[in-house]
Regions:
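Extreme N-terminal segment that seeds HTH/winged-HTH DNA-binding domains in transcriptional regulators
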Residues: 1-36, 40, 80-82, 86-124
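Intrinsically disordered, low-complexity segments enriched in polar/charged small residues
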Residues: 16, 54-55, 70, 111
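Short glycine/serine/threonine-biased micro-segments
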Residues: 21, 26, 49, 64-66
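N-terminal helix-turn-helix
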Residues: 30-63
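Minor-groove-contacting beta-hairpin "wing" of winged helix-turn-helix DNA-binding domains
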Residues: 33, 67-73
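A short, flexible beta-alpha/helix-coil linker loop
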Residues: 76-78
Length: 124
């Protein structure tokens, strides 16, 4: 799963959210069940259920009684928007803090960011 510092139920939510964002789970498709997630991640089903509950609360999944959880039509847009809102605090701030500790100036930091972005295919 994701960041080990996050509670397990948050890691489950992010795991399923990843499937939505990358297109592995499409709108209308059934999401993995709590038991499937629990078995896959070797966790308690209640923990998996709590993670799925986050996605229901966020409008990414919807419950269909007797059928399971399904991806909502607007799931990907909601998930991407939520991640964009978290991005600066969760990823950029720690990277900038480390750059300051290492004594990078602005130009060097920009060069490093460009180099990494290019190596990951961002500018193609």
């Amino acid at each position: 799963m994701n960041a080990e510092s996050d509670p397990l139920f948050v890691q489950v939510a992010r795991f399923v959210e990843d499937l939505v964002v990358d297109g592995s789970l499409e709108p209308g498709q059934r999401a993995p069940s709590t038991n499937e997630l629990a078995a896959f991640h070797e966790i308690n089903p209640a923990t998996a259920r709590k993670g799925l509950g986050i996605l229901v609360d966020d409008g990414i999944l919807e419950k269909r009684r007797g059928l399971g959880m399904f991806v909502t039509p607007e799931a990907r847009e909601r998930a991407v928007q939520a991640r964009r809102e978290r991005y600066a605090g969760e990823y950029l701030a720690p990277a900038i803090d480390e750059a300051v500790r290492l004594g990078y100036d602005r130009a060097t930091l920009h060069t490093l960011i460009d180099r990494v972005a290019e190596s990951r295919g961002m500018y193609q």
